[in-house]
Amino acid sequence: MSILVRDPDLKRVRPVLTAVRERAPLVHCLSAAVSMGIVADGLLAAGARPMMTETLDEAPHMVTLANALLINLGTLSTDGSEGIPATVEAAQGLGLPWVLDPAAVGIAPVRTAMARRLLKRHPAVVSANASEVLALAGEAGGRGADSTAIPDEAVRAARQVSALTG
């Protein structure tokens, strides 16, 4: 189930954070090189255990050890175009939840096509700014990782993306 979160309700967030801290899930991250440290620190602060790799040939195997998967398209490479779908497929085969961060989607055709294909794989969460949401819905995208759209402009598009992901 997808949820469009505008104003998070702390009563709903607290039990999730408590569960993460109790279970300490191992999260396999295929993240942009520029954000790996930040992602790892955020996961550690939440109580999860990050596992990073830049070797996409081994990523489908490494996900078999994980409890969840994060895919960030921030520095998509030719290897990523081949390794990411296989890793998502492996995670889904294990019933693992996965997060899609379509960083800077809408600025280049390869990245945009990859993000739209991944949406059809039903991520549990899509972490995107307003410009990225608009691009995922087939509307104009931004100019990089920073949003150029006003969040209120992306609400309808976010509902479309939510419907696509189930």
Residue ranges and their predicted role:
Residues 72, 80-129:
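Glycine/small-residue-rich loop that forms an oxyanion/phosphate-binding "nest" at active or ligand-binding sites
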